[in-house]
Amino acid sequence: MSAIRLGTRASTLATTQSEMVAGLLRSEGLDVNLTTITTHGDTSTASLAAMGGIGVFASAIRAALLEGEADIAVHSFKDLPTGRPLGLAIGAVPARADPRDALVARDGLTLHDLPQEASVGTGSPRRAAQLLAVRPDLTIVDIRGNVDTRLGRVKGLGRYAKNGGKEDLDAVVLAASGLARLGHSGAVTEFLDPSVVLPAPAQGALAVECRTADSRHGKLAKALARIDDRRTRLAATAERAVLSHLEAGCAAPIGALAQLKPVSGKSLQVLTLDVVVAAVDGSRTVREQVSVELPAEVEPALAAAHTLGVTAAEELLDDGAADVADLKASGSTR
C-alpha cells in the first residue's frame, strides 16, 4: 500500500492535530505523509462570522479529497459543516480532548475578577453571547489570527506572538483543547465551566474525513476503525445533530455538550446532552437538558444519539430559541 496523503491546513494547530492523527495511523502500520492545502479561511482577513462561518476552513480540503489530491484529512470537528458532500465519510473520530473553553487573562484574572468593561477577545458569537449573559459589562472584541497571535493580544503576553503581540486586551477566550495541543495550557487563567459557557458542538474532537469507498474496505478502513473512539463519536453525533436540525453553522450562538455515563446496576449507558442558544448581546438564553439510555450495539446507539440531538433542538424551539437567534427546524419530529 502506498503512503497515505493526509491533507492539512498550514497553521501550527492544524499541522499539530494532523501529526497527532498521523501518529495514530502509523502505530497501526500505515505510512502517512502530510500534504499542505491553503483554504479561503487562511487567506482572508475578514472575521469568521463575515466569511459565513460554515465550512470556511473545510471546503478546499474536501475538494482535495474528492479530486484525489489527498486520501484523508483531519478537521477540528467543531468547524466542520454538518452537511457532507457525496463521496466523503467521517472515517474516524479519535478520543476527545478537553471540550471546555478557556480564559487567558492578564494578571491571572478569572472571568469573575475581570474589571468592569474589560476587553475580551473572541471570534466566536457563541462565546461572546454567553460571556455577555454573565458579564453584560464586558467589551467584546472580534479577533482573528492563530492561537499565538490571539494570546499575544493579552496585556503582558505579547511574547507568545511572532515579533511580539499588540497586548491591547484584558483577556481572550480560546478552546482549551487547542491550547493544550500547542503546549500553552499554562497560559490559562480559568477553564470556563460548561454551566457558564457551553462549548461548541464537538469542540475538542477531531474528525478524520476520507472518501466513502476508503472508509469501508482495505487497510486504511481497518486502521481508521481502530483509532475511532465510540464515546467521542456518540457525543459528537448528539451535539452536531442540534446544529443540523436547527440548520445552523459553526458560527451560530449555540452551545452543546454531551456526556456518557454508566447506569448503576445496568450494562447500559446514559447520554446526557446540555444545549444553549444565546442572543448575541447576551440579553436572553435558552437552555435545555435531555437524556437517553443507549443500546449496546454501535449503529442503534449512534441513531439514538442523533435523535437525542434532534429532541434537544425541538425543545429549544419550543422554548422560544428561534426568537433568541435566527434559527429554524430542518424538520419537526413532533
UniProtKB/Swiss-Prot annotation:
Cofactor, how bound (note): Binds 1 dipyrromethane group covalently.
An example Gene Ontology molecular-function term: hydroxymethylbilane synthase activity
E.C. designation(s): 2.5.1.61
Cofactor: dipyrromethane
Record field: catalytic activity: 4 porphobilinogen + H2O = hydroxymethylbilane + 4 NH4(+)
Pfam families from the UniProt entry: Porphobil_deam (PF01379), Porphobil_deamC (PF03900)
Cellular component GO terms, alphabetical: cytoplasm
Pathway entry: Porphyrin-containing compound metabolism; protoporphyrin-IX biosynthesis; coproporphyrinogen-III from 5-aminolevulinate: step 2/4
Keywords, sorted A to Z: Porphyrin biosynthesis, Transferase
InterPro entries referenced in this protein's UniProt entry, alphabetically: HemC, Porphobilin_deaminase_cofac_BS, Porphobilin_deaminase_N, Porphobilinogen_deaminase_C, Porphobilinogen_deaminase_C_sf
Listed GO biological process terms: protoporphyrinogen IX biosynthetic process
Residues that bear S-(dipyrrolylmethanemethyl)cysteine: C250
Family stated for the protein in its record: Belongs to the HMBS family.
Subunit details: Monomer.
Function: Tetrapolymerization of the monopyrrole PBG into the hydroxymethylbilane pre-uroporphyrinogen in several discrete steps.
Something else known: The porphobilinogen subunits are added to the dipyrromethane group.
The protein, known as: Porphobilinogen deaminase
Gene name for this UniProt entry: hemC
